[in-house]
């Protein structure tokens, strides 16, 4: 019987063990999509204690604590001490068996804290608290120190078009820190015309872009100025959170002007008008990304802020989101084709939150390959609720069956935590185990050099190549 969290955790055959330890374990991390706060990297934040670095902003843990019956004051309470929240988490962890949080918790204790051979829970919480806090006091456990310990080469943060990017600029000019921290363009608030805050957001966009917005062309002019600002700060990717994927044929500019002006006057748009405006913005943006060599990411299918009472209390990203079930195949097909028809579809990564859509995404990606770009349109890694063992397995198997696993750009943290880099380790172990199983069953050749190269490519090389800007030397 294998021990829990041993060196061969999740590696269930000899080929898997060789692939992981000889090829995957030491590969650098190219974390192309995350939600880290660039200010914390620029200022090299030091964390006061384990509770702070572990629980602050981590809605995965918050959801589990609520399920365990923990009082909300011990989860998000502003007056509650970090130690009290930490103790509540310690009470919760033994109840999470079968949930990836149990694995992640112990992986995060092992790396970077070096704590293994001990199960986290109420009985061990104080011992672990003191050990980790002692380490957090050292420079190697600052925000930057942890990134360096985890062999991170690049992180792509998530940034609004109105952001100044001052912290990215500060990091880029700091010669003492060699990890790339690049902005990613996230224009959700400009293409989601139906949202309550749209009018106020347009005023913000007007101010930062120095453009008066009264017509649709003014929106594009303002966005183009901000795209140039992001490009000047090294941006190479855009991301879009799309709860309800819409498509409508793009009308002429007179119609788009009318839609925008109606909305800015406080009017309520029809579903057709919303779809027309959204499609027009997304297609225009996609063409802009293609011209710049950027990667377009689409995260499709979440239902956000389901609990309106808790949304009023805590705001967004607090652990009250879930999987949607809208149909996506037809609007996605038409949206991508609207860019591709003029040969202006950018490199694209598609993520679906509902696993029933895996095959839809995998087969859709193959419709729009080309341009001499390996894996131009990608079926992205298991996202959010699929960011667990079974979800990763499903994505890997369906990608391999319906596309080319060898061209996959691999894992990302999609996290707000500096301790989440162990998710790359988790993914790598699962990847190596899958390939090892196939090889040892005789389903693929047990050719160590070939398999090792595929592992190294998926862990790092493919992403580095894929996100490179035109003419960039690797």
UniProtKB/Swiss-Prot annotation:
It catalyses: D-glucuronate = D-fructuronate; aldehydo-D-galacturonate = keto-D-tagaturonate. SUPFAM superfamilies: Metallo-dependent hydrolases. The gene is uxaC. Its EC number is 5.3.1.12. Belongs to the metallo-dependent hydrolases superfamily. Uronate isomerase family. Keywords: Isomerase. The keyword Isomerase applies. Pathway: Carbohydrate metabolism; pentose and glucuronate interconversion. One of its GO terms (molecular function) is glucuronate isomerase activity. This is Uronate isomerase. One of its GO terms (biological process) is D-glucuronate catabolic process. It comes from the Bacteria. It comes from Photorhabdus laumondii subsp. laumondii (strain DSM 15139 / CIP 105565 / TT01).
